[in-house]
């Protein structure tokens, strides 16, 4: 016979598994459609027209039209494609289901069009909204927060291909003063995260790790080097934090999302021309290309980091539907490679992992997620103690500092102005 605690944990197990599978399938379908549209826009269509896919006119044209298309979706779709991600945390309150079709279309257009944002925020919003809406009908006695936690855990597992990230994140959010043990509260979310991760693994494997030279033994000087690298990444990230609300306010003075996103897409196109095709899109595949290209110099890595960070700020400020974590990881990789090229005595494993830790910490203000991203991009167990130590001064630097989010004015409606 199972203990009553075990029976309590099992109550939400089946819904948790179902939510994890559904969260992954929604992500997979969206990414497959976006990939097909991306191939059409950036491979087949320019080839048919006899235009180079890295032609400045093509890059500017596609991104400008992408901005206009996303603006039209936000302007005319029911619910205006959900809330502006620049004003929302990664895990937020459920939105009305009527806003989801527009949000999905806006996300697919942005991913395919080369916008420097990832899928994490919109996918999270979609999955939370569906889980709350369907769960409230099927099991009305379960509160909305439980459905929100299960959906967000399933989505995190699906996004990263492992339940580890969900375990780390929810170990801090669910660790309250309740007498219920932490792992009792983590049981159902981890079931959802595991189901999401395993389902994603059936179709594709998220590839985060980079082919960076193995790091052997930690030295005391490496801790200082890592802390300096993280501080540099934090400084770069805080420039973006300062710019985002100001640019967002300036762009939204125009009130018309079609105009705002059209201009935003045009600016992204110019940045894409300067940075080249590797500076476009969400950044995960592109950072693999960046590491594989042995011809890049210190100045090239610096340019890519600056361009990607600027594109991230412009895309978020313009109202494109997307997340900021994946492009931030690209910025961290570019910064890390630049610093290694500048000071070869510091191993690339340290510069890249600590730069990722610093920039993701600025974007998410989540220590566990920052450690996780640094550890999966540069998978080396020798680095883990160093990263944990480097996290301490990095966290001190950011204590009390503003987050990479825009405070929504009180008079502004729940969704974008139209």
UniProtKB/Swiss-Prot annotation:
InterPro entries: Chloride_channel_YfeO (IPR022969), Cl-channel_core (IPR014743), ClC (IPR001807), ClC-type_chloride_channel (IPR050368). Keywords: Cell membrane, Ion channel, Ion transport, Membrane, Transmembrane, Transmembrane helix, Transport. Disulfide bonds: none annotated. The chain crosses the membrane at residues 10-30, 54-74, 99-119, 120-140, 149-169, 186-206, 223-243, 258-278, 300-320, 322-342, 343-363, 371-391. It is found in: Cell membrane. It is a multi-pass membrane protein. GO terms for cellular component: plasma membrane. GO terms for molecular function: chloride transmembrane transporter activity; monoatomic ion channel activity. Its main location: membrane. HAMAP family: CLC_YfeO. Belongs to the chloride channel (TC 2.A.49) family. This is Putative ion-transport protein YfeO. It comes from Escherichia coli (strain SE11). The gene is yfeO.
């Amino acid at each position: 016979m199972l203990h009553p605690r075990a029976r309590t944990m099992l109550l939400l197990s089946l819904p948790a598994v179902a939510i994890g599978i559904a969260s992954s399938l929604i992500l997979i379908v969206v990414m497959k459609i976006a990939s097909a549209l991306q191939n059409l826009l950036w491979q087949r269509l320019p080839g048919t027209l006899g235009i180079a896919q890295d032609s400045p006119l093509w890059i500017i044209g596609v991104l400008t039209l992408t901005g206009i298309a996303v603006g039209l979706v936000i302007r005319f779709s029911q619910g205006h494609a959900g809330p502006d991600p620049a004003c929302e945390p990664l895990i937020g309150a459920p939105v009305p289901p009527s806003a989801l079709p527009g949000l999905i279309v806006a996300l697919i257009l942005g991913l395919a069009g080369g916008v420097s944002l990832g899928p994490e925020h919109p996918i999270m919003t979609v999955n939370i909204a569906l889980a709350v809406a369907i769960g409230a009908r099927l099991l009305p006695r379960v509160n909305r927060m439980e459905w929100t936690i299960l959906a967000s855990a399933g989505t995190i597992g699906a996004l990263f291909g492992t339940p580890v990230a969900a375990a780390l994140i929810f170990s801090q959010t669910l660790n309250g003063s309740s007498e219920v043990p932490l792992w009792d509260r983590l049981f159902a979310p981890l079931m959802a995260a595991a189901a999401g991760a395993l389902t994603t693994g059936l179709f594709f494997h998220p590839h985060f790790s980079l082919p960076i030279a193995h790091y052997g033994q930690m030295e005391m000087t490496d801790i200082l080097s890592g802390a300096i690298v993280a501080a540099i990444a934090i400084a770069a990230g805080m420039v973006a934090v300062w710019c985002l609300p100001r640019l967002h306010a300036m762009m939204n003075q125009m009130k018309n999302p079609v105009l705002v996103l059209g201009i935003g897409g045009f600016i992204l196109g110019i940045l894409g021309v300067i940075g080249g095709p590797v500076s476009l899109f969400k950044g995960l595949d592109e950072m693999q290309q960046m590491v594989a290209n042995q011809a890049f110099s210190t100045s090239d890595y610096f340019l890519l980091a600056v361009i990607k960070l600027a594109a991230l700020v412009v895309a978020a400020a313009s109202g494109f539907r997307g997340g900021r974590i994946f492009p931030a990881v690209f910025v961290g990789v570019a910064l890390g490679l630049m610093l290694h090229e500048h000071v070869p005595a510091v191993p690339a494993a340290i510069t890249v992992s600590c730069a990722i830790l610093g920039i993701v910490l600025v974007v998410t203000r989540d220590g566990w997620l920052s450690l996780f991203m640094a550890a999966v991009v540069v998978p080396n167990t020798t680095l883990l103690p160093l990263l944990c130590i480097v996290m301490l001064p990095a966290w001190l630097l950011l204590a009390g500092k503003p987050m990479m989010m825009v405070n929504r004015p009180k008079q502004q409606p729940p969704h974008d102005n139209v």
